[in-house]
Amino acid sequence: MAKEIPDLVAEARAGTGKGAARQARREGKVPGIVYGDGKEPQPIQIEFNSLLTKLRAGRFMSTLWNLKVEGQDDVRVVCRGVQRDVVKDLPTHIDFMRLHRNTRVNLFIHVNFENQDEAPGLKRGGTLVVVRPEVELVVTASDIPEQITVDLTGKQIGDTIHINDVVLPKGVKPTIDRNFVIANIAAPSGLRSADNEEAAAESEATEA
């Protein structure tokens, strides 16, 4: 299932240059520009509070947005730069790049863990420790997966799940060439305490 692309509502901005940008800010807007895909740059402005909320939510720069401007066709964009006030650290200008449907882009994709009831390690009281609830992947703009799935069937206490253990959708790959950890199954605290006591007893016996 393709991932739902969040909307980002903006307005067309008639003027360009510093004067027009200052006017936009006085009106509670953040001026910006949309470029790329072989088309003319499009000046826009976004409502300040709406943009600030999205920026503070995180992952703004690595999210694919469906840009909606009244009177124009929706376009898929990614943010390529946010200028901020040096004192207040608030956005003063924003740049977006248009994406063609075949464009490859880096995005964070949710990790879903299934068949937890089929994992012996969890049945014994182990805990699923999620190291990466999202994974940054290289995907095609027209076919972004909703999530990637980790099958926990047969997983035991002490098992570790790496990215290479996950079957990724066709055409999708990690952004980094390393077999990083996604999650592991940790022993319950009682079992860890018993193991530690047993190890300590063995150590004392050896020393004696």
Curated annotation (Swiss-Prot):
Pfam family, one: Ribosomal_TL5_C
Alphabetized Gene3D superfamilies for the sequence: Ribosomal protein L25, beta domain, Ribosomal Protein L25, Chain P
GO process terms (BP): translation
UniProt keyword annotation of Ribonucleoprotein present: yes
Cellular component per GO, a single term: cytosolic large ribosomal subunit
InterPro entries hit by this protein: Rbsml_bL25/Gln-tRNA_synth_N, Ribosomal_bL25/Gln-tRNA_synth, Ribosomal_bL25_b-dom, Ribosomal_bL25_C, Ribosomal_bL25_long, Ribosomal_L25_dom, Ribosomal_uL5_bac-type
CDD domains: Ribosomal_L25_TL5_CTC
GO terms, molecular function: 5S rRNA binding; structural constituent of ribosome
Keywords from the UniProt entry: Ribonucleoprotein, Ribosomal protein, RNA-binding, rRNA-binding
Family: Belongs to the bacterial ribosomal protein bL25 family. CTC subfamily.
Subunit structure: Part of the 50S ribosomal subunit; part of the 5S rRNA/L5/L18/L25 subcomplex. Contacts the 5S rRNA. Binds to the 5S rRNA independently of L5 and L18.
NCBIfam families in the record: bL25_bact_ctc, PRK05618.1-2
Protein's job: This is one of the proteins that binds to the 5S RNA in the ribosome where it forms part of the central protuberance.
The protein's name: Large ribosomal subunit protein bL25
Taxonomic path: Bacteria, Pseudomonadati, Pseudomonadota, Alphaproteobacteria, Rhodobacterales
Gene behind the chain: rplY
